[in-house]
Amino acid sequence: MKKFSEKGLKNVKVETAHSLAYKHIVFQNNYKVRPQGYKIYEIAELLGLEGNGEKHAEYIVANHISKFISYFCNSDKARVQDLNYLEIVSDPKAKTFVSTFYNYIKRKTRLLLSKMDKGEIEITHDFYLKKFQLVSPKLKYDYILFDEGQDASAAMLDVFFKQKATKVIVGDTHQQIYGWRFAVNSLEKADFKTYNLSTSFRFSQDIANLAMGVLKLKKIIEIEAPFQIAGKGTTKKIKSKAVIARTNLGLLLKAIEYVTEKKKVKNIYFEGNINSYTYADEGASLYDVLSLYNKKRRLIKDKLIKEMRSMEELEEYIEKTEDVQLGMMVEIVREYENKIPNIIKAIKEKHIDNDDKENAEMVFSTVHRCKGMEYDTIQIVNDFITKEKLEKLANEIQKDELNIGKLNEEINLLYVAITRTKSSIYIPETLMPPELPSSKQIHIIRVAKEKENKEATTQKPTLKVNTETDGKEKAYSVDELRTKHKDAYKPWAEELDNELTIMYCEGVNVKDLAKHFGRTKGAIRSRIKKLELKELYG
């Protein structure tokens, strides 16, 4: 906006979809907006949800109501009943639960929306954007340019497409990574003449070739990506360095490695601040989950976690709600246990403030948090989808549209991560596209095979964290963890439980079970306890 003002262009306005909606809806209706949305326990209390005899059912229902509202508000549908919420539920246990309580969930979803509409309670950001779409606004502009179109929701697009102005939508369909926020493939929905902007002045042709090589993996899921990128960037002096991961867990593992092994790194910075990686959107923290793990419920601050009597109850809640953030926290707690406070303390001691970000020796970020940003050199964490994993999953899903979309987004995540660099990249060999020529700007990190000597690898420093709580020392290998635990967040389906039971009865130890199922030892022990295998089979 400042640039337009400096040029004397007073007839140009820069708005987000939400800022437009806010002016048209919130002001005119005198609504009060709830900044952070409603927490699960708040929804349960507001609607007077009942447990119906099933453990924590009121909170599980509230979780699905929250997601159903988000699904509806981001859609272009006029009524809640025009959507089938079950279509976006994939976990078998979650699907069973939602099927059982579907009418109840739908009815209470409509009730919560009605309360917001009448002004009985504060409205959410999703709500006023949805209401903006439903009133079919006529915007008095001659030209409308929609940037970052690949991230648009169906509700945003509906408003955009209905305008009489000359419309332009800009975006990169391969940078669509917000499917979990119900972003749609908007660029393909726009029946406009296409003009390709295929030249990047950020990076060189070698990096462009790497990015295109990743996009070619889409052929595995039968998606054509005939996308040519011309890299016109020039090599620059290395100032900013970043570590980019797919998940919070992958990023935390790498950060621990830097603060415990690479002592020379004194100043680090987390995009979005370190606290955002230790707290879930709902407010639960790693410390809450750790307190539950240690059976010290009196120390738990989050109301939802405090309702859980054990880790098993929390994991059951996670399975029935598909709460990915809580699931990751459980994995971290089971892996690091009481070392977590010292780990977070060590990271925070080296973390610098936002104003001093340029002085950070290393920036840490997930792909979602650094989208739109750039760094001189980057290191990719080994927690993205590999060609081998992609081929395996593609054979399993049998052209299910929902899962194909998720795999497409997994490829996009790696593509977005790679294209954050301006000069060079350090990337695990498992993530390298086949038949790519060598380059001085692309540094391949060797990933050791399981049988190889750990000390012989080029990028597998042993990770040791000492605490005063138990006097023990535990060693971790970041890439080994990712290799072993590649299925850590995959739901425990019935066939997997049967396989686990058989192997347990055959005397296979926990370490080998963890390796076989691609999960942590803590997760295996938890499942053995949940299935009561020790009680049944000794």
Segments from the language model and where they lie:
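Conserved helicase/translocase P-loop NTPase motor core
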Residues: 97-162, 342-367
